[in-house]
Amino acid sequence: MVTDKLLGKQSVMISLDVDGFLFDRLNQITKAGFNLVEINSTDVKLFTSIKNQYPNLKIGASGVISTSELEECYNAGVDFASSPGFLPSIAQTASVYSMNYFPGVATVSEAMAANSLGFNYVKPYPATLSFCTLLNKCMPKVSILPTDIEFEEIEHFLNLPSVSVVVINNPDIKQLIASMNATQSIA
């Protein structure tokens, strides 16, 4: 796992739902200069199509809830995967494949369990500013990727030292441009 290399200097990950606008959004994301995209699906045919059409994007699978889904996504060539919660079996399978994996956590105990298995990046879900502040305080060496946050709260989350990347869902082109500007002003 080379998570730091995967995330790079980009502080915003784009999360996209699978709908009729998916490929339009992927075009907008590419034009806006983002390259870290999480697709809310585990459909391996979809990932193959996206990876072929957008070879410069780092594509992740979101919503992984079983080891078999994780293995299928890995075999489809996704760059990373995440789950809405934490299951040791999924985390251990990701470790076996040396796969970039971001376990979802809803409690400090889940973050501790993920960290004890070697995962230094977690996705609080749901990500509230108060929960992320608590994780930042209790586990300052764990990097936090707040998920599905409100666009207007990006700067608040990025001001927490443990937050390395924020995840915004289905942004429009204006939000993409504003996100790029906001993250550049913080950096």
Language-model features: locations:
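Conserved N-terminal beta1-alpha1 strand-loop-helix module at the mouth
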Residues: 1-77, 95-96, 173-187
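Catalytic beta/alpha-barrel core
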Residues: 15-18, 34-43, 58-65, 78-87, ...
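Short, well-ordered alpha-helical microsegments
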Residues: 22-23, 44-48, 67-70, 87-91, ...
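Glycine-rich phosphate-binding active-site loops on the catalytic face of alpha/beta enzymes
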Residues: 80-90, 123-131, 161-182
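Strongly charged, low-complexity linkers/loops
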Residues: 133-137
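Hydrophobic secondary-structure block in the mid-to-C-terminal portion of proteins
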Residues: 139-187
